[in-house]
């Protein structure tokens, strides 16, 4: 079904263009400060030297008949996090730490696992080869136990060495998808065209390696869920609202999806919007894209896009559109705890409109998925809701 008449193309994108001008003006007024701490893209020689220094410390401890230990920044405490509107959540420079002792029953196994993965990283960097987190796990799956153990240790090492995961020569398999008005060349020379069709393109596993990015997109739309993303593809949304770019992280975004969103913003400075469910989980996912997460706060400068705006689904939209009660879902106790947690986070104080939307949700004790809009029509999301939001500036 075609869109309702909206006047000439230029007038449709008028509000979007003004929004972009305001974003560019904000960048000119101050913009984002260059990284002063946290991780960075380090040279191979720097990474090798850092690992050698750690091993030297272990040898020195053993020579003194002392039990060696790793000192790891505590990535799970809000006390170690500071908030800056231009960066998001980032780790403070002098944060609290924890000791991973080799002679403690509670941490001896983790000490040995860190040492093993450090050894693997050293060999990867030295030989200029790469491995995925999954590859590392399967070198000894029984020893590691599960993939999460490997993931956490790699993040701890990245934080300990103050370098990015890419500098460790460790890649992660991407689960995200991208479609729309975007072309680029991958590190191996492969030319990729994301022109929207029936299928999308997988987010590359090496975002730093892609080059020659080209787009005419007026905006980037981050879609929380794969099902919604696929529905918009089926509805030919990218072509109907061309030029644009759509991305999904299929729920909580992986590192590569976040890196890609950041790269698109840094390269093109076009408005970036999120489309998430009107529930605490969707709001948290949006916050991860915009302000980052506590566990990855040491990489904030490489991952966050504070210019992101919340396009939908807003809790206030539910009443405005008369979404029937049988399409709404009661908040669970877990939902309420999550919502309370988000409301207490430092970035909410600078987002009064977000706070208002979350308070509407808390007061109603109801949530809704994007699919709730299908009560109006099966293609209401792509035909009416999103075009009107984008044309008339319905974001916060």
UniProtKB/Swiss-Prot annotation:
GO BP annotations, alphabetical order: double-strand break repair involved in meiotic recombination; female gamete generation; male meiosis I; meiotic DNA double-strand break formation; meiotic DNA double-strand break processing; meiotic telomere clustering; oogenesis; ovarian follicle development
Query: PROSITE patterns from the entry?
Result: TOPO_IIB (PS52041)
Under Gene Ontology molecular function, one entry of this record is: ATP binding
Q: Which residues bind Mg(2+)?
A: 224, 277
Quote a single Gene Ontology cellular component term: nuclear chromosome
Listed InterPro entries: Meiosis_Spo11, Meiotic_Spo11, Spo11/TopoVI_A, Spo11/TopoVI_A_N, Spo11/TopoVI_A_sf, TOPRIM_Topo6A/Spo11, WH-like_DNA-bd_sf
Q: List the active site.
A: 138
Expression tissues: Highly expressed in testis.
Domain named Topo IIA-type catalytic is located at 42-177
The catalytic activity, as recorded, is: ATP-dependent breakage, passage and rejoining of double-stranded DNA
Q: Which cofactor does it need?
A: Mg(2+)
Q: Which Gene3D superfamilies match?
A: 3.40.1360.10, Winged helix-like DNA-binding domain superfamily/Winged helix DNA-binding domain
Its localization reads:
Nucleus
Keyword field: DNA-binding, Isomerase, Magnesium, Meiosis, Metal-binding, Nucleus, Topoisomerase
What's its EC?
5.6.2.2
Its assembly, as annotated, is:
Heterotetramer of SPO11 and 2 TOP6BL chains. Interacts with TOP6BL.
Q: Which family does it belong to?
A: Belongs to the TOP6A family.
Q: What does this protein do?
A: Component of a topoisomerase 6 complex specifically required for meiotic recombination. Together with TOP6BL, mediates DNA cleavage that forms the double-strand breaks (DSB) that initiate meiotic recombination. The complex promotes relaxation of negative and positive supercoiled DNA and DNA decatenation through cleavage and ligation cycles. Essential for the phosphorylation of SMC3, HORMAD1 and HORMAD2.
Q: Which PANTHER family match?
A: MEIOTIC RECOMBINATION PROTEIN SPO11 (PTHR10848:SF0)
Q: What protein does this entry describe?
A: Meiotic recombination protein SPO11
Question: Which species is the source of this protein?
Answer: Homo sapiens
């Amino acid at each position: 079904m075609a869109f309702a008449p909206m006047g000439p193309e230029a007038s449709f994108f008028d509000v979007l263009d003004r929004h972009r001008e305001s974003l560019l003006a904000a960048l000119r007024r101050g913009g984002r400060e260059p990284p002063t701490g946290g991780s960075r893209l380090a040279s191979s020689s720097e990474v090798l030297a850092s690992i050698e220094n750690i091993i030297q410390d272990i040898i020195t401890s053993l020579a003194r008949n002392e039990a060696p230990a790793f000192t790891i920044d505590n990535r799970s405490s809000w006390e170690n996090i500071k908030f800056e509107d231009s960066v998001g959540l980032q780790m403070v420079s002098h944060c609290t730490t924890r000791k991973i002792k080799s002679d403690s029953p509670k941490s001896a196994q983790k000490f040995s696992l860190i040492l093993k993965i450090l050894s693997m990283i050293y060999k990867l960097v030295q030989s200029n080869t790469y491995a995925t987190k999954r590859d590392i796990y399967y070198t000894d799956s029984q020893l590691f136990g599960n993939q999460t153990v490997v993931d956490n240790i790699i993040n701890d090492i990245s934080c300990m060495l103050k370098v990015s995961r890419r500098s460790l020569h460790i890649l992660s398999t991407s689960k995200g998808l991208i479609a729309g008005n975007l072309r680029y060349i991958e590190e191996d020379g492969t030319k990729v065209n994301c022109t929207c069709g029936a299928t999308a393109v997988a987010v590359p596993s090496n975002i730093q390696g892609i080059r020659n990015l080209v787009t005419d997109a007026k905006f980037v739309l981050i879609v929380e869920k794969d099902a919604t993303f696929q529905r918009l593809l089926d509805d030919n949304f990218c072509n109907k609202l061309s030029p644009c770019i759509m991305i999904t992280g299929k729920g909580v975004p992986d590192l590569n999806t976040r890196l890609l969103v950041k790269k698109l913003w840094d390269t093109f400075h076009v408005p970036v919007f999120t489309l998430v469910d009107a529930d605490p989980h969707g709001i948290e996912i949006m916050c991860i894209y915009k302000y980052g997460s506590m566990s990855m706060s040491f990489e904030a400068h490489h991952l966050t896009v504070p210019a992101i705006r919340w396009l939908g689904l807003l809790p206030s939209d539910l009443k405005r559109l008369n979404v029937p009660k049988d399409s709404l879902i009661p908040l669970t106790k877990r939902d309420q705890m999550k919502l309370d947690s988000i409301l207490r986070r430092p970035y909410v104080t600078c987002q009064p409109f977000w706070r208002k939307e979350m308070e509407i949700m808390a007061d109603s004790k109801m949530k809704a998925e994007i699919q709730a809009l299908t009560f109006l029509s099966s293609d209401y999301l792509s035909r009416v809701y999103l075009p009107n939001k984008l044309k008339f500036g319905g974001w916060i």
